[in-house]
């Protein structure tokens, strides 16, 4: 059963307290904890009451305040004494670090030279008599080469000034190449192979990989020559000239759209040649759109190339030189 028990006056026998005595509460101003407990009929437990809001002594508060004031009064005096004895800032240490390698090498050379001179003096003291000690380490401020260059300066208005001295020993570049001209390679048939002159005026334009998209991805006919300038130059030159003759035939006809013709140097445009799977030179590729219709690796004359172009682009009869098995049909 539940009872309200007051800890300070709980009897041993079971009893029920419904309230607190008014006189008792007046005598003891401090509130008491009252809580329910279960007490058996045989024994009643004693409980201790503890006040949560105990009244503090006002004198103790005054004592703590006075102690705080005394501490505050003492601390500035102690700080001033410490400031007088010790500096406010810790002085910085001198910078320490590795010396540069150049300084270390210079010190090592100097010390080794001094040791060498001292040993020489001990062995033969007459060596350094009436002679100043040579400075073997070159001074950075003095440069003998600059002094020599300053002495060699010649005025621009000198009448003896040689012509085109920047090119050579007073020889003009034009005079040199007049006496020693650059000769082009001569082919097997006696024709001169002029790759540089062919760039300026040619029926077959040379392109690079950046220009490839504008030429390849177009529905009009395209003939591509993959060649090498300096390897099998005679064969590459002859194939180029035969292709130029065949292209010129269609340009002169004027009754239909002539095919476009470009050439690619295998040694320069390596990535483009790899993409086209062109490993041997010379070879001619017949393209339409983005597809290679046929790959010709053998040498063909201009007449044979005219028939091949007519077959692939203008629906003409297939010539005998075209292998049907290697032709890729255009859809």
From Swiss-Prot:
Intracellular or extracellular location(s): Plastid, Chloroplast; Plastid, Chloroplast stroma, Chloroplast nucleoid; Nucleus
Result of knocking out the encoding gene: Seedling lethality due to deficiency in chloroplast development. In the rcb-10 mutant, impeded PIF4 accumulation leading to lost warm-temperatures responses (e.g. 27 degrees Celsius).
Keywords, sorted A to Z: Chloroplast, Nucleus, Plastid, Transit peptide
Annotated tissue distribution: Expressed in leaves, shoots, stems, cauline leaves, flower buds, flowers and siliques.
Bias (Acidic residues): 142-160
Region (Disordered): 52-105, 141-160
Self-association state and partner proteins as the record states: Component of the transcriptionally active chromosome (TAC) complexes. Interacts with FSD2 and PRDA1. Interacts with FSD3 and CITRX/TRXZ. Binds to PTAC12/HMR/PAP5.
Its job: Plays an essential role in early steps of chloroplast development. Involved in the regulation of plastid gene expression. May positively regulate plastid-encoded RNA polymerase (PEP) activity through binding to FSD3 and CITRX/TRXZ. Involved in redox-mediated regulation of chloroplast development. Possesses disulfide reductase activity in vitro. Required for the proper function of the plastid transcriptional machinery and protein accumulation in thylakoid membranes. May function as molecular chaperone to ensure proper organization of the nucleoids in chloroplasts.
Record-given protein name: Thioredoxin-like fold domain-containing protein MRL7, chloroplastic
The organism of origin for this protein: Arabidopsis thaliana (Mouse-ear cress)
